[in-house]
Amino acid sequence: YNTYIFNETIRQNFMLAKENVTEDEIYTALKKVNLYNFIVDNGGLDKVITEDAANISGGQKQRLALAINLVANKDIYIFDEATSNIDIDSEAIIMNNIKELSKEKSVIVISHRLANVVAADTIYFIEDGEVKEHGTHNELMNMHEGYAKLYTTQKKLEEGYTEVIA
């Protein structure tokens, strides 16, 4: 199931993932992604999402897509850059839900931001279309190769960014 937010009501978007979805299931999923109050305060489940979800923020769109996926209840989930171009709060909500989901389901996370995959059972470091390294975060860090170098660089950049805005 490839999540796309359609120009329909929120309820109808959930029904595309699970035809017989209940309001309780929808509200539970919305609470998990911290959208419950926003949806209830802005038209409820009958709120129409405009073309390309232009009437909600990028973070809200990503969290709504995740909520729809949670209701779909599949065995395998693939998240491809699930936290790209969103605010830090939305990123934390999404990653916490993905981590929780991975306790019961098979989850594949594709991410350029390595901080999002540190807790993964296995990380595949791909460069130029080829798997160059694989292992846990600690194993890859101990190799002192591509993954470790990129992770360290990203961490330094993020720490520098935090210092600049603090």
Please annotate each region the language model reported.
Residues 73:
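Conserved catalytic motifs of ABC-family nucleotide-binding domains
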Residues 77-81:
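Catalytic Walker B motif of ABC-type/P-loop ATPase nucleotide-binding domains
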Residues 36-64, 157-166:
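ABC-fold ATPase nucleotide-binding domain signature/coupling loops
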Residues 24, 41, 96, 118-166:
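C-terminal portion of ABC ATPase nucleotide-binding domains
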Residues 66, 110:
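Hydrophobic anchor residue at the start of the ABC signature
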Residues 11-51, 95-96, 104:
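ABC ATPase nucleotide-binding domain helical subdomain, centered on the C-loop/LSGGQ "ABC signature"
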Residues 100-109, 117:
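Conserved catalytic loops of ABC-family nucleotide-binding domains
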